[in-house]
Amino acid sequence: MEAKAIARHIRVTPMKARRVVNLVRGKQANEALAILKFAPQAASEPVFKVLQSAMANARVLADRDGVAFDDSDLFITEAFVDEGPTMKRFQPRAQGRAYRIRKRTSHITLVVATPEKEEAR
């Protein structure tokens, strides 16, 4: 069984979010939650929420299909961060100049699956 969760337009730069996602890629879901809970990076909070959502989606799919479900069976099979739209702002500077400030956003995607699905690939 495979479940997916996506968070779009998250106000964190993709590079910083990728640092956090790389920490949990391939890990067991409950272990990843523990890692994210104590990670000092600000991007760990949205990744934590996406992982919780993916686990909840897996639970709903299992209930719908009538399959036995256990959180400890889930592993993160795919985890990636794509760049979202960039908000452009201007910072006034001396002598009539202006610097462009780019406020970057991210799309965070996590896929969790049970080991049977992982072996079938």
From Swiss-Prot:
| Keywords, ordered alphabetically | Ribonucleoprotein, Ribosomal protein, RNA-binding, rRNA-binding
Q: Name one GO biological process term.
A: translation
Pfam families for the chain: Ribosomal_L22
Q: Name one GO cellular component term.
A: cytosolic large ribosomal subunit
Annotated InterPro entries? Ribosomal_uL22, Ribosomal_uL22_bac/chlpt-type, Ribosomal_uL22_bac/org-type, Ribosomal_uL22_CS, Ribosomal_uL22_sf
List the Gene Ontology MF annotations in alphabetical order. Answer: rRNA binding; structural constituent of ribosome
CDD domains the record matches: Ribosomal_L22
The record's similarity note reads:
Belongs to the universal ribosomal protein uL22 family.
* NCBIfam families listed in its UniProt record: rplV_bact
| Subunit structure as annotated in this protein's UniProt entry | Part of the 50S ribosomal subunit.
Could you tell me what this protein is called? Large ribosomal subunit protein uL22
Q: Which organism is it from?
A: Paenarthrobacter aurescens (strain TC1)
